């Protein structure tokens, strides 16, 4: 499965191939600081999951190649929107589906195509950020059982972090709802070295590494008792 390669089809593989540093030729190849905000309707039901992915400086610099340096804000945003549309189309691939799953108990919750897609550039940090929202096809309540949001790239091409104090927010949640962040498992040194040895064009992971990669999911558990 080359979902992570398809995700950023603007040339990440080319970037990994031409850079000679050790970090450029090891899994993972991209680092994202993520944020999740859970959105509710007036009845207290979860209706959408908003996400922001802030990309590392190396990928941000590469993705901005070719953009006009002296363009005004409107022209620059138009170019960034084009990039965002390319990324979100790749992310919509059924095999990756935004690297995000929602579930309640043993039931997977269906979500629609990403909406409110926007790419922004922060000149202070020199990083690009992708913002999008995933609407649930049917609103759902967490009164009887928790709802879990999971974010992971099963090929470990992309590594996520949700360490910021405001990484998980519920601005429109009912007062009784609480969202808890459950971090992924920690890789042991041997597994980390095996992943680091994989080439940038590696698609499917070996079966044992694929199983381990699944344990690296970042989970947000919503409870509304």
Regions of interest found by a model, annotated:
Residues 29-61:
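Early extracytoplasmic/domain-onset interaction patches
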């Amino acid at each position: 499965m080359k979902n992570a390669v398809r995700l950023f089809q603007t040339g990440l593989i080319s970037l990994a191939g031409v850079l000679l540093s050790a970090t450029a030729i090891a899994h993972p190849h991209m680092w994202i600081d993520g944020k999740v905000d859970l959105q509710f309707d007036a009845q207290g039901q979860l209706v959408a999951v908003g996400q922001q992915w802030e990309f590392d400086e190396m990928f941000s610099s590469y993705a901005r190649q070719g953009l006009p340096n002296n363009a005004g804000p409107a022209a620059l945003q138009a170019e960034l929107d084009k990039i965002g549309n390319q990324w979100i189309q790749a992310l919509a691939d059924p095999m990756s589906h935004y690297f995000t799953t929602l579930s309640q108990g043993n039931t997977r919750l269906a979500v629609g195509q990403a909406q409110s897609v926007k790419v922004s550039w922060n000149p202070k940090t020199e990083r690009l950020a992708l913002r999008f929202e995933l609407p649930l096809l049917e609103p759902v309540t967490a009164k009887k059982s928790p709802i879990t949001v999971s974010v992971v790239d099963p090929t470990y091409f992309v590594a996520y972090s949700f360490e910021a104090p405001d990484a998980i927010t519920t601005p429109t949640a009912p007062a009784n709802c609480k969202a808890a962040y459950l971090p992924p498992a920690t890789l042991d040194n041997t597994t980390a070295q095996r992943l680091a040895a994989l080439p940038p064009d590696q698609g499917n992971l070996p079966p044992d590494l694929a199983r381990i990669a699944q344990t690296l999911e970042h989970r947000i558990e919503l409870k509304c008792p």
